[in-house]
């Protein structure tokens, strides 16, 4: 992050602007909207600035710039076409630890002006850190179109009701949940439509409803890795959470989307490492919900596909805890799509089968004859440690040893790796593949070379290192 976004209160604070032309005019208009005490240093003023000076909306010094003018101001803006003067202003401000902006010269700026969407008191600021101003402007225009013009009334009303709410709703969590209901319900739609009286009545009705004592559990699929694959409903859920229990498969970019003051607790499991037993995870979820919290159980991929999500919701149901399920993009769909491997294709596969290689020792064995059929794609989760057995059994039950296979590691992530070969090479391919990894068996794998779009690839012949750098 090149710049820290800040909102500065400039009301009655002195701001020095060097320059009196059109460049300065644009900045001064924003400063006056923020009620700053604008001091202009320029030999002449544009007609618009001269009018503002005549109306005493700003003060004007028709003198040359001197370093001492920077001593008693809050911000400094150089808005001239004189490069030497701009350099002097920057040096003087920097030496006195004043924030300074030299218009259209990022190297001489300790702060930059963002593009602004003004729904006061609600403000949205967009910045490209000076890299792409046009992109910032385009984003601002899109956000302008999305946000209703009356949106600021919601914030004004919230400010009015805040102190009153503290006497009715005594905990921070209760107040937050109240505002989440209000801002997504009838009150918000009425206020945005301009019907303030009915909106206030709707808010009072919501306040008179009894606060629930029990929270809820929302089981959310985080997708296979790429934060862009998190569903909109999933994003809404993690933005509402009081506490998020997540596993190791949830990537950091997804976790960064969680509400900032939500508690994050890792309950993941990894082979060979200490992990939280499933029954303890179930208990943690139930206890948090019984405390009145909105609990999100965030799982990589889809929570109902080899994710043990159903077991956790069974515990919730037995405890009488309300719950929801937000599906996610499962690894077999996401990783193969990013690797350019379609799960089905009219010429190669009329079905796709998902199986797990991490099965319970006392469970019934696979129907290998069914799994070994041709004209189908086999996607195997958590199968790298059983790759030798999987390969041997499939070949023994009739699958051609030259059937194309792929091992997709860290699917949909920036460091995704796709290694291809044949079924008889599967053990070798999977041996040192980075985790998590998905095994894919089927003729559709041969389309990878033609359809791969996200990352480079490696073949069995070139795979002789513990980690293949495919970037």
Curated annotation (Swiss-Prot):
Name the InterPro entries for this protein.
Answer: 4pyrrol_Mease, 4pyrrol_Methylase_sf, 4pyrrole_Mease_sub1, 4pyrrole_Mease_sub2, CobA/CysG_C, NAD(P)-bd_dom_sf, Siro_Cobalamin_biosynth, Sirohaem_synt_dimer_dom_sf
Residues binding S-adenosyl-L-methionine, per UniProt: 224, 300-302, 305, 330-331, 382, 411
**Chain segments annotated as transmembrane:** none
Keyword entries, A-Z: Cobalamin biosynthesis, Lyase, Methyltransferase, Multifunctional enzyme, NAD, Oxidoreductase, Phosphoprotein, Porphyrin biosynthesis, S-adenosyl-L-methionine, Transferase
Region annotation (Uroporphyrinogen-III C-methyltransferase) maps to: 215-471
GO terms for molecular function, please? NAD binding; precorrin-2 dehydrogenase activity; sirohydrochlorin ferrochelatase activity; uroporphyrin-III C-methyltransferase activity
The pathway noted for it is:
Cofactor biosynthesis; adenosylcobalamin biosynthesis; precorrin-2 from uroporphyrinogen III: step 1/1; Cofactor biosynthesis; adenosylcobalamin biosynthesis; sirohydrochlorin from precorrin-2: step 1/1; Porphyrin-containing compound metabolism; siroheme biosynthesis; precorrin-2 from uroporphyrinogen III: step 1/1; Porphyrin-containing compound metabolism; siroheme biosynthesis; siroheme from sirohydrochlorin: step 1/1
Biological process terms in GO annotation: cobalamin biosynthetic process; methylation; siroheme biosynthetic process
Binding residues for NAD(+), per the UniProt record? Answer: 22-23, 43-44
Q: Which residues form the signal peptide?
A: none
Q: Name one Pfam family in it.
A: TP_methylase
Question: EC number(s) per UniProt?
Answer: 2.1.1.107, 1.3.1.76, 4.99.1.4
> Which residues does UniProt mark as catalytic?
247, 269
- Residues found modified as Phosphoserine: 128
NCBIfam families, per the entry: cobA_cysG_Cterm, cysG_Nterm, PRK06136.1, PRK10637.1
Q: Which PANTHER family match?
A: SIROHEME SYNTHASE (PTHR45790:SF1), SIROHEME SYNTHASE-RELATED (PTHR45790)
State the protein's purpose.
Then it catalyzes the NAD-dependent ring dehydrogenation of precorrin-2 to yield sirohydrochlorin. Finally, it catalyzes the ferrochelation of sirohydrochlorin to yield siroheme.
State the family it belongs to: In the N-terminal section; belongs to the precorrin-2 dehydrogenase / sirohydrochlorin ferrochelatase family. In the C-terminal section; belongs to the precorrin methyltransferase family.
* Designated name of the protein: Siroheme synthase 1
Q: Which organism is it from?
A: Klebsiella pneumoniae subsp. pneumoniae (strain ATCC 700721 / MGH 78578)
Q: What high-level taxonomic lineage is stated for the organism? A: Bacteria, Pseudomonadati, Pseudomonadota, Gammaproteobacteria, Enterobacterales
Q: Which gene encodes it?
A: cysG1
């Amino acid at each position: 992050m090149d710049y820290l976004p800040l909102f500065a209160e400039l009301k009655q604070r002195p701001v020095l602007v060097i320059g009196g032309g059109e460049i300065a005019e644009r900045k001064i208009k924003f400063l006056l909207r923020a009620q700053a005490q604008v001091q202009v240093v320029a030999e002449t003023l544009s007609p618009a600035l001269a009018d503002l000076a005549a109306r005493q909306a700003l003060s004007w010094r028709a003198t040359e710039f001197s370093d001492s003018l920077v001593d008693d101001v809050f911000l400094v803006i150089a808005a001239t076409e004189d490069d030497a003067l701009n350099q002097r202003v920057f040096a003087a401000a920097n030496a006195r630890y004043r924030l300074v902006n030299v218009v259209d010269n990022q190297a001489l700026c300790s702060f930059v002006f963002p593009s602004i969407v003004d729904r006061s008191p609600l403000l949205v600021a967009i910045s490209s850190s000076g890299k792409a101003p046009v992109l910032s402007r385009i984003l601002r225009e899109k956000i302008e179109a999305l946000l209703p013009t009356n949106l600021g009334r919601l914030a004004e009303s919230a400010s009015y009701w805040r102190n009153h709410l503290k006497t009715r709703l005594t905990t921070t969590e209760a107040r937050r949940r109240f505002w989440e209901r209000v801002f997504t319900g009838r009150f918000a739609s009425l206020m945005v439509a301009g019907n303030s009286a009915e909106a206030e009545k709707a808010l009072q009705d919501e306040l008179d409803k009894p606060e629930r004592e029990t929270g809820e559990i929302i089981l959310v699929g985080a997708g296979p890795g790429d934060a862009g694959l998190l569903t909109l409903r999933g994003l809404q859920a993690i933005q509402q959470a009081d506490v998020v229990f997540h596993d190791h498969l949830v990537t950091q970019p997804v976790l960064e989307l969680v509400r900032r003051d939500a508690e994050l607790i890792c309950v993941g499991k990894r082979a060979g490492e200490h992990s939280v037993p499933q029954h303890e995870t179930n208990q943690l979820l139930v206890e948090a919900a019984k405390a009145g919290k909105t609990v999100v159980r965030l799982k990589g991929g889809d929570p109902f596909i080899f994710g043990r999500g159903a077991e956790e919701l069974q515990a919730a149901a037995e405890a009488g805890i309300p719950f929801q399920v937000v599906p996610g993009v499962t690894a077999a769909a996401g990783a193969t799509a990013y690797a350019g491997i379609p799960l089905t294709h009219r010429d190669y596969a009329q079905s796709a089968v998902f199986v797990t290689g991490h099965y319970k020792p006392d469970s019934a064995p696979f129907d290998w004859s069914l799994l070994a059929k041709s004209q189908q794609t086999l996607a195997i989760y958590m199968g790298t440690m059983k790759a030798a057995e999987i390969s041997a059994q499939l070949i023994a039950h009739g699958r051609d040893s030259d059937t194309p296979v792929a091992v997709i590691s860290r699917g949909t992530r920036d460091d995704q790796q796709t290694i291809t070969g044949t079924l008889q090479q599967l053990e070798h391919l999977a041996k040192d593949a980075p985790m998590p990894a998905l095994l894919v068996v089927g003729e559709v794998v041969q389309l990878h070379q033609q359809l791969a779009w996200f990352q480079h690839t490696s073949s069995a012949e070139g795979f002789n290192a513990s980690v293949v750098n495919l970037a």
